[in-house]
Amino acid sequence: MSDTARLSVDIGGTFTDVALDVGGRMFTNKVLTTPQAPEEGVMAGVRAVLPEAGITAADLAFIVHGTTLATNTIIERKGAHTALIATDGFRDAVEMGYEHRFDQYDINIEKPAPLVPRYLRLPVRERCNATGEILLPLVEDDVRALVPILREQQIESVAITLIHAYANDKHERRVAEILQAELPELWITLSSEVCPEIREYERTSTACANAYVQPLMASYLADLDARLRAEGAQCPLFMMTSGGGLTTVETARRHPIRLVESGPAGGAILAGRIALECGLDKVLSYDMGGTTAKICLIDEGRPQTSRTFEVDRQYRFTKGSGLPLRIPVIEMVEIGAGGGSIAQVDNLGRIQVGPESAGSEPGPACYGQGGTGATVTDADVALGRISPDGFAGGSVQLSPELSQAALDKAIAQKLNLDGPLAAFAVSEMVEENMSNAARVHAVEQGKELAARTLIAFGGAAPLHACRMAEKLGMDRVIIPTGAGVGSAIGFLAAPVSYDVVRSRYSRLAHFEPEGLNKMFTEMHDEAQAIVASGAPGAALEERRIAYMRYIGQGHEIVVEVPARALVEADGAVLRAAYDEAYEALFGREIASMEVEILTWALSVSTIAPPPPRQTDIPEAAAASASGERKLFDADLTDFVMAPVYQRDDLTPGMTVQGPA
């Protein structure tokens, strides 16, 4: 086993990306994703990249994996047969959801269906209050009466979500003990473990989602681990989480819901490291793959994080129309605009792109695998942006004729456009959609865009980055080496980490550091034990945050908490930090209002070495073209002959005169 060979694999909707770092030398590969058996694509990518580096699986010291399997399982509703056990009177909280409508003007609004149907939402009598005081002891006979029902319904997995279990988990644990004794093969999720936070709907939804995907994810992880071992790998396997850290397979088996947005998190980490290398304070990360595009604001090299995420939105990108999850996640906006997104003309004669995707099977029309829809990739091929012979490292041969035929049928004939203009129109629409998403995201975060640098990666982002930067008023674009597998490269820079969250209501006017210090000690011990199991002996760092708001508000903002023993004076420190954060977001503070804290979070992670800073770029000769081909020029709205340059031939300081 080598100490320097590290491998990462990112499964996307269209391609599975592999990155291998051997002593600082990077080897990459892309293979088509195999949706029916994702591990097949993983193994194909691994077998393709190892010989390039001249090593075997036995030489690997580290493997990290990110996957969309959990997300797809929820969206496609292909998870386990799941039941929910809830406090009597509260089993419908997961279906009632929020009191407000995400679209108040649509009288035919469709809410996302719960993962657990009503006949499998089973009540038990018990009750705790918000402070954890037991008002009604658990009626254990109610739990035992559920056993034959669970057997009869052939339930594979159960979510246990009792009212106020975040404050006292005694009843949830007792329910689990009774069920485990009677049904030892049953998968059990406790809401007090996966989401020990206030807010009943989100906690229940998160627990149900974890239970829904757990059997499938556990089976997949066990199978993948066995396949890697059979290939000769002897090193540990880590999973990328949605919060931007790595975790062990065992932890991922218990909390698979934390893997939901693992792929995009790797891209944000890559962009953050590039920002630090280049000395950039503010950047916009732009990751466009085969199925979706992700946009993330990064300040001081650190992506913004959140505790909320929605999956399976019923209305295109409408907040509130999906299933809410309370998990650590990197804050980003995601739209269904990838290389495989299908373009069509709607009833009003407008070009719409996505969210439907051709995926990897059958793929865009130019793949020649039976796909007939006109996709963004087909438009890029028709515009001369993609070499038909060099796509995915030459592993996929493209057909420009099939691209043009699909565009003619879907767009050109319906809008009376010639072929190139139809392709250009598709490209313009997808770039405008992404630019609008970036603008809205920046406004929601109280951030500006014009002064930022755009970092573009993913299989499709570099093709659209310059036009998108122009629309956003940005004057610098960075396309890193290995951009096509950017998320997989980002995995290799991620720390081993774990986040612990606790809901503990506190008012700053009555700040109690003793109780908080005890809570933080317990949280630290829990997180450190998990991180140490994956990185024994490694130096660790700790970060604490509080979710704060003015009394009476319905949303919180994140404030850093000193990672040390708190004292009474820290109440004033937190108040000042909150006022500053609130003013940055909303343009003012409200000094007369009292501040409260609902939730506290602590993360422990290994310390990633800082990336080397880029020194002054030396002057170099002009780059030499390897050839030329026809390229559609947006300003001329016509084709021009443009030089072609190989990315590997470009060295720091070289210049290229466009269009190229």
Predicted segments, located by residue:
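Metal-dependent DNA phosphodiester-chemistry modules and their immediately adjacent helices/loops
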Residues: 192-213, 217-229, 489-518, 522-523
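Glycine-rich beta-strand-to-loop/alpha-helix junction loops that act as flexible
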Residues: 67, 162-163, 191-193, 242-243, ...
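Conserved phosphate-binding loops in N-terminal lobes of ATP-dependent enzymes
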Residues: 17-19, 28, 32-36, 41, ...
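Terminal amphipathic helices with adjacent charged low-complexity linkers/tails
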Residues: 157, 161-207, 211, 389-391, ...
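Glycine-rich phosphate-binding loop of actin/hexokinase-like ATP-binding domains
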Residues: 20, 29-36, 83-89, 109-111, ...
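Short, ordered loop/turn segments at secondary-structure junctions
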Residues: 87-90, 163-165, 193-195, 242-244, ...
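N-terminal glycine/serine-rich phosphate-binding loop of ATP-dependent small-molecule kinases
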Residues: 1-83, 129, 136-158, 172-177, ...
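C-terminal, non-catalytic interaction/recognition modules in large multi-subunit enzymes and RNPs
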Residues: 11, 141-145, 149, 280, ...
